[in-house]
Amino acid sequence: MKTSATSFIPGSLVLAFCLPVVATSPKTLAIPEKLQEAVGKVTVNATTCTVICGLGFKEETVCEVGPDGVRRKCKSQRLECLTNWLCGMLHFTLLIGKEFKLSCLSPDILEIGQGAFRFTWRLARGIISTDDEVFKPFRASSYFIKFQSIQEYDSGTYRCDVQLLKNLRLVKRLYFGLRVLPPNLVNLNFHQSLTEDQKLVDEGLEVNLDNYSRPQHPPWKKKVAIAVGIGVAGGVTGGVLVSIVLCGRLSVIHSSASLETLQALLPKGGMLRKPD
């Protein structure tokens, strides 16, 4: 009995494994006629978003495709797109009294209309930071802030949040780092401080800066350098002559003092005689 029971169990297992194979043998499925004639809409082409952050647009082409694979009734449509709502920070350095404007929307998105968005501005006055804890509300409800005559007090970090009014979805956050300097503090003319070769490079031309030679100084600088050199040379020469004269006088005085000392040491009536 034990032997028959043992042989029955493996036989049952083999039969159990074979049944699914027989039950799932491939069969030809009949597709209904309605499905064979079905037509679907397929996106056949799409452009990238017009902006890399914030709300933008993209173009899509949608066609009807049937069982034969032929495209029919193709239409192009312009759709909103959002790849990333966080747009980083833009830095600006300005002089006091200049007119300036901050704008957190691109012209193409304004085609929808300013009324479709909600704009919230916040300010971290006097510092450049993206820490949300240092920002305080700033009174502005438009997509831009305009400074008629900017002052040092206006420096800091401005944050603009853009939301869709229909669902209050945040679609853009942009920071503006603003530095305001007095006009007599620094010369902001970067191009003026460049050398001739560097100006050519700045204009997009190829220049080998390894063979760069120092620029020629203006004529008035050469004259000043010559005058300074002559003055220094004259001063040194005069100092040497004065030193020679003083040394000569000191030698004469020292010689006279030595003769007087020797004369005092000789007996009365004695005189010094020059050697033959």
Swiss-Prot record:
Compartments where located: Cell membrane
Glycosylation sites: 45, 211
TM helices/strands, residue ranges: 226-246
SUPFAM superfamilies, sorted: Immunoglobulin
Keyword Translocase among UniProt keywords: no
Keyword presence, Disulfide bond: yes
Positions in the Cytoplasmic compartment: 247-276
Alphabetized UniProt keyword annotations: Cell membrane, Disulfide bond, Glycoprotein, Immunoglobulin domain, Membrane, Signal, Transmembrane, Transmembrane helix
Disulfide bonds: 104-160
Signal peptide: 1-24
Predominant location category: membrane
Gene Ontology cellular-component terms listed: plasma membrane
Extracellular side of membrane: 25-225
Subunit structure: Forms a complex with IZUMO1 and SPACA6 on spermatocyte cell membrane required for fertilization.
Name used for this protein in its record: Transmembrane protein 81
